[in-house]
């Protein structure tokens, strides 16, 4: 029995990046031997064991043979005779096919170290096309390592294109697609994930709502970048710079889906695109089982981003209605999330990336003023039942009016 550190831990150590997870490969062992040493078996499809003390994963060396469509369509051979080289051959990229023994010796049969130095994402073998999930994984690695100047090898991108056209992507489960999406949103450059998917044809298959935005024009005076798809990528890039909250990044990604539905005769204008996008967001979230908190924020941003941009033009009572509708009273963090997404939208335009967004501070002031109204003071004045709610609303509007520098509206 011989144990090797494999995969991301070796790769990230060589890149001098923080190592989060340690995965190990065991050559020359049987499940019975692992169990006798106190390891706990957790793998259903192939033998994976947890170390009795550290809880780290130890997988028996294995080979895989394609037997059916999709991510799980493989038969596995994890016999003790499977070699280190055979196991590494089944992996997706050369940079993920490097092993290290307990003495620190590196094993690199497929030249992953050279590709790390060249900053290239390259497939290990043509068996790459047997697993459609690898299209998403490579796109995610391209996003994750974009700051290190990694690029995808042309021959690998060609295989990704072949996979995207094969119909195999449709066999991926919603959970697997969403997991890769969420991991991609967590990177410093999530827009690269979608740009790569578009380049290889996978965006149209998995995220047609986003693909549909490319080629849709916007008014050049507001959007020097013109193309809605390019704008969306720029907004996502800005959102990643402004916040590490994935729900904000997701909202930025889908905020303009409705523009793809604008009648051609009305282009480049997009009247009511916020409201038109709501059903598209609901459908996408249902399809990939996106968490409710992501969905709800995305719907709010889609519905209200145009109002937020022109917030100083809105009446005080309209603002209080917005606070009610968005339930900011109970979820004040949602206001911050909304404003960050809207700021990203404003900055996600060619040449306007450094522009200030004063709307955020203004709306925060309005909300702080409205929030300062206390229910107990209204009750102390003798109001009861429905009157309390009415007076609370009146006083909140008055406080917002004061922020706007206007005279309070007469109570009715």
UniProtKB/Swiss-Prot annotation:
Domain HD span(s) in chain numbering: 228-329
Swiss-Prot/TrEMBL cofactor(s): Mg(2+); Ni(2+)
Molecular function via GO: ATP binding; CCA tRNA nucleotidyltransferase activity; cyclic-nucleotide phosphodiesterase activity; magnesium ion binding; phosphatase activity; tRNA binding
PROSITE patterns membership: HD
A Gene Ontology biological process term: RNA repair
The keyword Nucleotide-binding appears for this protein: yes
Catalytic activity reported: a tRNA precursor + 2 CTP + ATP = a tRNA with a 3' CCA end + 3 diphosphate; a tRNA with a 3' CCA end + 2 CTP + ATP = a tRNA with a 3' CCACCA end + 3 diphosphate
Recorded superkingdom: Bacteria
Cofactor binding remark: Magnesium is required for nucleotidyltransferase activity. Nickel for phosphatase activity.
Entry binding sites for ATP: 8, 11, 91, 137, 140
Quaternary assembly: Monomer. Can also form homodimers and oligomers.
UniProt protein name: Multifunctional CCA protein
Lineage: Bacteria, Pseudomonadati, Pseudomonadota, Gammaproteobacteria, Alteromonadales
Annotated gene: cca
């Amino acid at each position: 029995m011989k144990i090797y550190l494999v995969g991301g831990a070796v790769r990230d150590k060589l890149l001098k990046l923080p190592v989060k997870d340690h995965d190990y490969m065991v050559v020359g062992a049987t499940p019975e031997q692992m169990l006798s040493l106190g390891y706990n078996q957790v793998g259903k499809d192939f033998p994976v064991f947890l170390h009795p003390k550290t809880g780290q994963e130890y997988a028996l060396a294995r080979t895989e043979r394609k037997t059916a469509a999709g991510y799980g369509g493989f038969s596995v051979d994890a016999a003790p005779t499977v070699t280190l080289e055979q196991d590494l051959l089944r992996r997706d990229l050369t940079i993920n096919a490097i092993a290290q023994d307990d003495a620190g010796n590196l094993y690199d049969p497929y030249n992953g170290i050279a590709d790390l130095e060249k900053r290239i994402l390259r497939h290990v073998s043509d068996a790459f096309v047997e697993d459609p999930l690898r299209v998403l994984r490579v796109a995610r690695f391209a996003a994750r390592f974009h700051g290190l100047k990694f690029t995808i090898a042309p021959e690998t991108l060609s295989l990704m294109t072949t996979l995207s056209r094969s119909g195999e992507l449709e066999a991926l489960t919603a959970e697997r697609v969403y997991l890769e999406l969420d991991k991609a949103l967590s990177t410093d450059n999530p827009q690269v994930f979608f740009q790569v998917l578009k380049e290889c044809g996978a965006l149209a298959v998995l995220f047609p709502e986003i693909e549909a935005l490319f080629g849709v024009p916007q008014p050049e005076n507001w959007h020097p970048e013109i193309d809605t798809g390019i704008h969306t990528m720029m907004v996502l890039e800005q959102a990643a710079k402004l916040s590490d909250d994935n729900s904000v990044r997701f909202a930025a990604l889908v905020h303009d889906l409705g523009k793809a539905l604008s009648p051609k005769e009305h282009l480049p204008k997009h009247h009511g695109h916020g409201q038109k996008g709501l059903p598209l967001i609901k459908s996408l979230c249902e399809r990939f089982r996106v968490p409710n908190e992501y969905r709800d924020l995305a719907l709010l941003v889609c519905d209200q981003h145009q109002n937020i941009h022109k917030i100083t033009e809105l009446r005080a009572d309209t603002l209080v209605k917005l606070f009610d509708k968005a339930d900011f009273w109970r979820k004040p963090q949602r206001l911050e999330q909304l404003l960050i997404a809207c700021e990203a939208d404003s900055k996600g335009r060619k040449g306007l990336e450094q522009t200030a967004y004063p709307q955020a501070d203004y709306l925060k002031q309005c909300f702080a003023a409205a929030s300062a109204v206390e229910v107990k003071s209204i009750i102390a004045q003798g109001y009861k039942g429905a009157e309390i709610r009415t007076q609370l609303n009146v006083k909140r509007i008055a406080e917002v009016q004061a922020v706007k520098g206007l005279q309070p509206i007469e109570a009715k």
